[in-house]
Amino acid sequence: MNKLIPLPREFFARDTNVVSTELIGKTLYFQGKTAIITETESYIGQNDPACHAARGRTKRTDIMFGPAGFSYVYLIYGMYYCLNFVTEAKGFPAATLIRGVHVISPENLYLNGPGKLCKYLGINISHNKCDLINNNAFFVGDIGLKLPYSTTARIGITKGTDKLWRYVVTDITNLISQYNVQP
């Protein structure tokens, strides 16, 4: 049985697209539920019109300016929460949106869409600005899983749609049957 431990802050404090691709196959642990990350999107800096920090630093976007390895949770359409992980060097606003996961515990369930995964896991605005490194209840770990993924344009946005910054697993059949993970 593998013991799941949080990834180090250095994992998140890198180029956002590198972090987004390397999060594919990593394990998200949240309050007793374990899921494999299957889809991510990058939002990078003030030159990315789809990034919340494109217009500068605000109370809402302050967390995006670092340090890396913290959660950025916000509400969209007045009803859906979205989970992001802050990336890059402190002072540079960037984050990876977690768009999809495959839950492996307590049940086997594929969740496509950031709102669906937050609803199922119970993630809400109270989980904004959580340290993912020094936290036993909410973190990302690595069980050595490498999954094939494709790169596409980001979806669900109206600006910055030309960026190929969405990463999605190409085959989820029999995804996790050989892994036994214990947080």
UniProtKB/Swiss-Prot annotation:
It comes from the Bacteria. Disulfide bonds: none annotated. Pfam families: Pur_DNA_glyco. CDD domains: AAG. Its EC number is 3.2.2.-. SUPFAM superfamilies: FMT C-terminal domain-like. GO terms for molecular function: alkylbase DNA N-glycosylase activity; DNA binding. It is an enzyme of class 3 (hydrolase). GO terms for biological process: base-excision repair. Keywords: DNA damage, DNA repair, Hydrolase. Belongs to the DNA glycosylase MPG family. This is Putative 3-methyladenine DNA glycosylase.
